[in-house]
Amino acid sequence: MAGESKLTDIHVHLDQYPREEMEQVLRRAHKSGVRWVVTSGMDLESSARAVEIAAANERVLASVGIHPWVAAENFPAEFHEKFRNLARENVTVAMGEVGLDFVDNVFSGVTYHDNQDLREAQEQAFRGQIELACELTLPLIVHCRGAYSSLAPILKEEKAYRARGVVHNFEGDERQASKLLDMGFLLSFGGTITYPDATELQRIIRYIPLDGILIETDSPYMPLHLQSTDKNEPANVARVVQIVAKIREVDTKELISAIYNNFNNLLNLKA
């Protein structure tokens, strides 16, 4: 598998590794056959770092965005111009990580399920980033947790099909998957599907069209089932692909090639 160099990881956060560790992580990814990694920002600082990392590593691409967890912050006027400039960088191939998250944040203690102001702030920030993505013809890398009933209507209202995109770490149901696919969005799967209780996701993977699938690790988060460490990394995308191939009962090499094409088509890359 390592010799093919066709594996792709649509969603990681390389800025979360110390610099020396990140370099080791990228070397292991290359050795495992990973051709492309997209590192996503969550705010202005991490988006700038994503662009910096991508500019310094030929196998890394950048995605810039405002994560729903920070969407309620008051951003000064100059912030928007700085963000727009990052989105225009040559190594920037997508807008993300953007979206909606109505699940209470255990890290910050912020509750969303009963806080209408925070939910509206997320929706407003999301709509603004969809508009920018459409303007710059950049696909969206969408984060969605506990908000699938709101996601599709917003994408439809904002005509997000003009930009297209991928819902990373998809956790919705079959009906929600169909709606997103009908709008031209792809669904990305990662470590979650490796767990024995992920039967609903595995069923969705089995039925959706092959041209609607992408693979991710969300490194350094979302470790795989029975992984030896708590910290995930892009090299593990090889195992995710093998599990998807097993679920779909298809040849692993054929699946890798198909996902590689999906990745290139979404991000407008040359094969």
PLM region spans:
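Mid-domain alpha/beta scaffold segments of enzyme catalytic cores
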Residues: 1-271
